[in-house]
Each structure stands twice: as structure tokens, then as C-alpha cells.
Design a protein with these regions (language model features):
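Ferredoxin-reductase
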Residues: 4-93, 143-147, 156, 172-174
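FNR/FR-type flavoprotein reductase catalytic core
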Residues: 1-7, 74-230
């Protein structure tokens, strides 16, 4: 409990974007901010009626002075209420970062798979990639419609900056369902020797992993992040 209090920092909300797929909130610290690693999550509490209850969300962007961004999909009562009520200037507390979803400790060849708003940790991952990155990383970002994609400018910037990183935007409305067979065909390396990093709906993860096992292409390591906070 003391550690949680120590990690809790006051923030001001500086920007709110109501994107078709998510409510994107930017905030800056009042004083010392948190210093999370890419892919971490934080517990936030917004000082506005109906939004004070603490909820955990993955941090989709980390700034040099402790600034943070959250990209939050309306999955339940709280997140839909947040979309309706949150405003620039609102005060919030941010506690974190937490979690073990950390690509930096992974294998040389990595497949990142994002389903919908599950892109959030991968946005922070991509921001952290540099020209010196030696891994080969393939990101398959699955959305239903093109307008649901979040942060494409940041992902494409990472693709230009880092020669080992490649983005594949899979739009299921036009490209069809993302099956294990389709996924395996997109990968430029041996999946059986690679690491898989997944964030998205649990049924999607189960179907893909089951399919990859049947294909004899089950990854050497599997890491996944739960994000369906309501």
C-alpha cells in the first residue's frame, strides 16, 4: 500500500481526442511524473463526478518529462462514461507503471499482433525503437475498418526509422478474417524460433494460437496483455 502511494502522481489532462475507436487522453504531471517503461499500464483516477473510481489502462505513449497518453475503448459503463465526461483541464492521479509486457527482454525475431485497441502497448513499443535496433519485428495490426486504426502516423514513423520493423495493417472488412494461416503467411521469419507478443480480445488470441499449433508454427515464446478493462 505504501509503494502504491509512492507511485501515485498528480496529473493535468492536456488533450482529449474522441477518436472513432477510442478516447485518447494526454496528461502532464504536476511536478514529478511517473517513469514507466514502454508497454506498462497505470491505474488512473479522474477528479470528475463518475470518474473517480481507479481503473487500470495500458499507457500508449510516454513523454520525456513524464507525460503520458491513454487510448481507451468504450467497453463498459466506466469507459463509456469517461468518453462522455472527461475534459481538458481535469485533474487526475496516475499510479504506475506496472506489468511485465516488455519486448526488450524478448527474442531476436518478434511477431507483434494487435487486435483493435490492443494496439496501445505496441504504440509505446514502436515509439521506443531506434535506428540501432537489431531485432526483426513484424507488427500485424488487425482492425475491422480503416477508420478504427489508432496511431498509424507513429507506427509508420517507427517503420521509417527502424529498418527491422515492419507494419502490416490488416483490415478484416476487406482483407477477410485474420486466421492463423493468414498470420503465418505474413511473417518473414521462422515463427517456431520467434516470440509472439499479443494484445487484443481473448477469443482472437485463443483461435490464433490454436491454429498456429495445428500448423506446426507455434511460437517459441508467447506473451500477452489483458486490456479489457471496463
Amino acid at each position: 500500500q505504501f509503494l502504491a502511494f509512492y507511485r501515485r502522481r498528480p496529473y493535468d489532462i492536456t488533450n482529449v481526442e474522441r477518436h472513432p475507436a477510442a478516447t485518447i487522453i494526454d496528461a502532464k504531471p504536476r511536478g514529478r511524473g511517473i517513469r514507466p517503461r514502454p508497454g506498462a499500464f497505470a491505474v488512473i483516477s479522474i477528479k470528475r463526478g463518475g470518474l473517480r473510481e481507479p481503473h487500470p489502462f495500458t499507457i500508449s505513449k510516454v513523454g520525456p518529462e513524464g507525460e503520458v497518453q491513454f487510448s481507451i475503448r468504450g467497453l463498459g459503463d466506466y469507459t463509456r462514461r469517461l468518453r462522455d465526461r472527461v475534459e481538458v483541464g481535469d485533474k487526475m492521479t496516475v499510479e504506475g507503471g506496472y506489468g511485465r509486457f516488455d519486448y526488450a527482454k524478448g527474442r531476436k525475431d518478434q511477431l507483434w499482433v494487435a487486435g483493435g485497441i490492443g494496439i496501445t502497448p505496441f504504440l509505446a513499443f514502436a515509439d521506443s525503437l531506434t535506428e540501432a535496433e537489431t531485432r526483426t519485428i513484424k507488427l500485424v495490426y488487425c482492425v475491422t475498418k480503416p477508420e478504427e486504426a489508432v496511431g498509424l502516423d507513429r507506427l509508420r514513423a517507427a517503420e521509417r526509422r527502424c529498418k527491422g520493423f515492419e507494419l502490416d495493417l490488416h483490415v478484416s472488412k476487406t482483407d477477410g478474417r485474420l486466421t492463423a494461416e493468414v498470420l503465418a503467411d505474413k511473417v518473414p521469419f521462422d515463427l517456431a524460433r520467434a516470440g509472439l507478443w499479443f494484445c487484443g480480445p481473448a477469443p482472437m488470441r485463443t483461435a490464433l494460437l490454436s491454429g498456429l499449433r495445428k500448423l506446426g508454427k507455434y511460437p517459441a515464446s508467447v506473451h500477452f496483455e489483458e486490456f479489457e478493462f471496463r
